[in-house]
A protein has these predicted regions:
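Proline-centric
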Residues: 2-4, 13-16, 83-92, 178-185
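Generic, well-ordered alpha-helical scaffold segments in large soluble proteins
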Residues: 5, 9, 13, 35, ...
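Extended, domain-scale alpha-helical bundle/helix-rich regions
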Residues: 6-74, 78-80
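A short beta-sheet element
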Residues: 143-146, 150-185
């Protein structure tokens, strides 16, 4: 087994919940998802986010197969779910637990405060290490940029395997090739 195969095997075991014992006293994912739903309802009421037109609901059928309901349509996810997960876990779509769609606020770099952080794709190393921290003024940035806030998850939309992913330690603006999103809960 090569080092890469070992790494992939460990990662697969981790996402399947097989590296540590599953404690039956741990809060099930369904409780967290209820809190996230309540938080989203509050944000909708405060008009900070919009209600989804056709939200996705993933559930296990009587045959123990995962299904997804969107609007009135129900379809099997048997071909999309790559492995079984512990009973206390749940499959969800990223949009159900994050503010991906609401984080696309744009600003023109020339009108941005020159002292704020200006992040470019080459500033993030594969694996998530920050290589360089420059302000908008130091970069002499131009064009439209995407606004992000401290704690947002930033990832490269040009790297579908998400090797360039980073949690923002500060507020700032970034190149449109970097997509920020915020996880609820």
């Amino acid at each position: 087994m090569t080092a890469q195969q070992l790494k992939n095997s460990i990662l697969l075991m981790a996402v399947q919940g097989k590296l540590v014992p599953q404690d039956p006293n741990d809060e099930p994912a369904s409780v967290l998802l209820e809190r996230i739903h309540a938080e989203k309802e509050r944000l909708i009421k405060e008009k900070k986010i919009k209600r989804e037109k056709n939200p996705s609901v993933i559930f296990k059928g009587a045959d123990n197969t995962p299904y997804e309901k969107i609007g009135d349509e129900v379809r099997s996810l048997a071909d999309e779910v790559p492995f079984d997960i512990p009973d206390s876990w749940e499959w969800v779509r990223l949009g159900n637990i994050s503010s991906y769609a609401e984080t696309k606020q744009k600003v023109n770099a020339t009108s941005a405060d020159p002292s704020i952080w200006g992040l470019d794709l080459e500033d993030i190393e594969k694996g998530g290490r920050l290589l360089e921290y420059k302000t908008v003024g130091e970069r002499k940035a131009v064009g439209d940029k995407t606004v992000f806030t401290k704690g947002d998850i930033l990832y490269s939309k040009l790297r579908p395997y998400l090797l360039k992913i980073f949690v923002a330690p500060d507020d700032g603006i970034c190149t449109p090739e970097i997509v920020p999103f915020r996880v609820y809960g």
